[in-house]
């Protein structure tokens, strides 16, 4: 636990699943009100971070995650395997994202775990380059060894994303090639290296409410809390085992954002995949409930994202300052 967490009575690391579920199951208006109070006590409500996400190495992943279009196990998703992007190309994308208003640049590689060598060295150069632009840098590369986490920390990495996906009791129905303990070990290596943890999960995969809140309980009981918690709604991709799942009720996203905010008061709650399916009003309700970050740009790895100009207009409409330049203009 950090010194800041010790001095804040709202920070806890002893939640039970039943306690977290009792919060999640509150009447929705009461839940949003409570989450909003916690949010305003710990954050500027007009500060909604824009992060940009780029797939720097796409497809061919040996993992069998049931939701993922990049798994080599799912042959009919239409995602072709590609090599790692050149460093210079990635940094051009980062510069365009910064010009469009993003303050964090996230890079994802479809690996089970990175191998030491030229590709990992290139990722380190990308991290250094993004930091040199004055942006926060986040990567998601799969499982890490402690020495790899230390090298990323030395390169200046702000945060490492490694999602738990769901609660521990439902996890093996989604993934069989990587255990829950594997994921927790990588998160510990990241913490030990002094890198911020970005960790959340996905709803809409057939799990129950208890599985959702169990995931939040695991995260909230880590010390320190993750610096950011992505809340994703399943983007059902044809050709994956979960490709026929129905869409998530928007109120379920609101509940997850609000619950995450209450049990992890200082974390950034990142409204992530599935946001494209939410109305403007549903997104604003998520912001009121404590979400204070979005992915800004046309794509989230291999799936479409909300139009960048529409995002800019929404943020302006609710009083959040954004640059006048659009993402499309920045890339030209």
UniProtKB/Swiss-Prot annotation:
Pathway: Cofactor biosynthesis; biotin biosynthesis; biotin from 7,8-diaminononanoate: step 2/2. SMART domains: BATS, Elp3. Binds 1 [4Fe-4S] cluster. The cluster is coordinated with 3 cysteines and an exchangeable S-adenosyl-L-methionine. CDD domains: Radical_SAM. This is Biotin synthase. GO terms for molecular function: 2 iron, 2 sulfur cluster binding; 4 iron, 4 sulfur cluster binding; biotin synthase activity; iron ion binding. InterPro entries: Aldolase_TIM, BATS_dom, Biotin_synth/BioAB, Biotin_synthase, Elp3/MiaA/NifB-like_rSAM, rSAM. Keywords: 2Fe-2S, 4Fe-4S, Biotin biosynthesis, Iron, Iron-sulfur, Metal-binding, S-adenosyl-L-methionine, Transferase. PANTHER family: BIOTIN SYNTHASE (PTHR22976), BIOTIN SYNTHASE, MITOCHONDRIAL (PTHR22976:SF2). Residues 46-275 form the Radical SAM core domain. Belongs to the radical SAM superfamily. Biotin synthase family. The gene is bioB. Its cofactor is [4Fe-4S] cluster; [2Fe-2S] cluster.
């Amino acid at each position: 636990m950090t010194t800041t967490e010790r001095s804040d009575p709202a920070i806890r690391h002893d939640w039970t699943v039943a306690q977290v579920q009792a919060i999640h199951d509150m009447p929705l208006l009461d839940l949003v009100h409570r989450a909003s109070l916690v949010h305003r006590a710990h954050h500027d409500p007009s500060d909604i971070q824009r992060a940009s996400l780029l797939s720097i190495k796409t497809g061919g992943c040996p993992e069998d995650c049931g939701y993922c279009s990049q798994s080599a196990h799912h042959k009919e998703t239409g995602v072709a395997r590609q090599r790692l992007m050149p460093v210079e190309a990635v940094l051009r994308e980062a510069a365009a994202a910064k010009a469009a208003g993003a303050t964090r640049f996230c890079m994802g590689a479809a690996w089970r775990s990175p191998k030491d060598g030229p590709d990992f060295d290139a990722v380190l150069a990308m991290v250094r380059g993004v930091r040199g632009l004055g942006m926060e840098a986040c990567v998601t590369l799969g499982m890490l060894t402690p020495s790899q986490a230390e090298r990323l920390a030395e390169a200046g990495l702000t945060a490492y994303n490694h999602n738990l996906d769901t609660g521990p009791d439902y996890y093996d129905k989604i993934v069989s090639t990587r255990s829950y303990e594997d994921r927790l070990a990588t998160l510990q290596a990241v913490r030990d290296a002094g890198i911020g943890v970005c960790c959340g999960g996905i709803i809409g995969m057939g799990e129950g409410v208890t599985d959702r809140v169990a995931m939040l309980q695991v995260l909230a009981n880590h010390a320190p809390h993750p610096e950011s918690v992505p809340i994703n709604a399943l983007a059902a991709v044809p050709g994956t085992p979960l490709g026929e799942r129905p869409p998530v009720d928007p109120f379920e996203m609101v509940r997850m954002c609000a619950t995450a905010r209450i049990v992890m008061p200082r974390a950034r709650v990142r409204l992530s995949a599935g946001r494209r399916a939410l109305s403007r009003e549903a997104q604003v309700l998520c912001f009121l409930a404590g979400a204070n970050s979005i992915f800004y740009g046309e794509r989230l790895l291999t799936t479409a994202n909300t139009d960048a100009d529409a995002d800019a207009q929404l943020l302006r409409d609710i009083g959040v300052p954004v640059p006048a330049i659009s993402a499309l203009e920045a890339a030209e």
